[in-house]
Regions:
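Conserved thiamine diphosphate
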Residues: 1-31, 142-143, 148-149, 196-204, ...
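Short, surface-exposed connector motifs at secondary-structure boundaries
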Residues: 7, 83-89
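Short, flexible loop segments at the rims of nucleotide/cofactor-binding pockets, characterized by
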Residues: 14-15, 64-70, 123-127
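Phosphate/pyrophosphate-binding active-site segments
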Residues: 15, 39-40, 174-245
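Structural/interface elements that position substrates and couple domains in central-metabolism enzymes
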Residues: 19, 69-70, 98
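Short, solvent-exposed amphipathic alpha-helical segments in soluble enzyme
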Residues: 22-27, 53-55, 102-113, 162-170, ...
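Conformationally flexible catalytic loops at phosphate/diphosphate-handling active centers
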Residues: 23, 27-84, 203-207, 239-244
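Glycine-rich, anion-gripping cofactor-binding loops and their flanking helix/strand elements
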Residues: 92-183, 187
Length: 245
């Protein structure tokens, strides 16, 4: 069981039960969220309760840590790279698991003028949006920047596998700049290989996408203010993606 969970525990005394539940819940819902496993020995369950003042958690306690923000300096660099690009693409995977991320990604993509490829492990972007390029491998052939947000398997959408020969070829140009926002190696397990081939990135920001996306949007909006050249380039990029939709 330990190989499949973030944390497992078996209390050996009734006094440890409330604390184990507090730790289990906090561990489970802290991003990257994952399952926990708790079990109780039959002896402990059947033993007569003799403790008269079992300490329970206070009502005003914070049940889990606040989400982790991404480094603003790295986000600023990412904004510069994307705004200077000709054909930037945002690759998204699991961000749809948090309420509100759907709308945050739409705002981010429209602000930056990026095409968006939703890997569809969790619905993250509307497929009727003009910037949606999911399953359009031709759009990746011109990508000069790819920003992955909460992506686990980079190779699946960006490469082609010939099943008969096991040959793998990339849809993306060799000089493409790769960047990442998400939990990266925090999601890794020493046992489970539920991740794809490692993709080297030029810029990586460790942080929760629910905070990083609006922050990156805000940074980009500041850079776009009173800069007609950047705005014109952004709008031109968006038209290229929308014309393919």
């Amino acid at each position: 069981m330990r190989n499949y969970t973030k944390w497992d525990y078996q209390p050996h005394a009734i006094e440890g039960v409330p604390e184990s539940f507090m730790r289990a819940y906090s561990t489970m819902v802290t991003e990257p969220a994952g399952p926990i496993y708790m079990c109780y020995d039959a002896w402990l369950q059947e033993e007569k309760l003799t403790c008269e003042d079992l300490a329970m958690p206070p009502a005003n306690m914070q049940k889990a840590p606040a989400p982790m923000g991404a480094d603003p300096d790295t986000l600023s660099i990412m904004a510069d790279v994307i705004l200077d690009a000709k054909h930037p693409v945002i690759l998204v995977d699991f961000i749809g698991r948090q309420p509100g991320n759907f709308e945050k990604l739409v705002t981010l993509a429209e602000t930056l003028g990026c095409g968006v490829w939703d890997i569809n492990n969790s619905l993250a972007f509307p497929n009727q949006h003009p910037l949606c390029i999911s399953l359009d491998h031709e759009s990746l052939k011109d990508a000069d920047v790819i920003l992955g947000i909460d992506v686990r398997d980079w190779e699946k959408p960006t490469h082609k596998l010939v099943s008969t020969t096991r040959e793998v070829t990339s849809h993306v140009p060799e000089d493409c700049v790769w960047m990442e926002i998400g939990f990266a190696e925090l999601e890794m397990s020493a046992w489970a290989f539920d991740y794809g081939r490692y993709q080297p990135k030029q810029h990586v920001a460790l942080g929760d996408p629910r905070l990083a996306m609006p922050e990156l949007t805000k940074i980009a909006q500041t850079k776009l203010e009173n800069n007609t050249a950047l705005v014109s380039a952004r709008d031109a990029r968006a038209r290229v993606f929308s014309d393919r939709h």
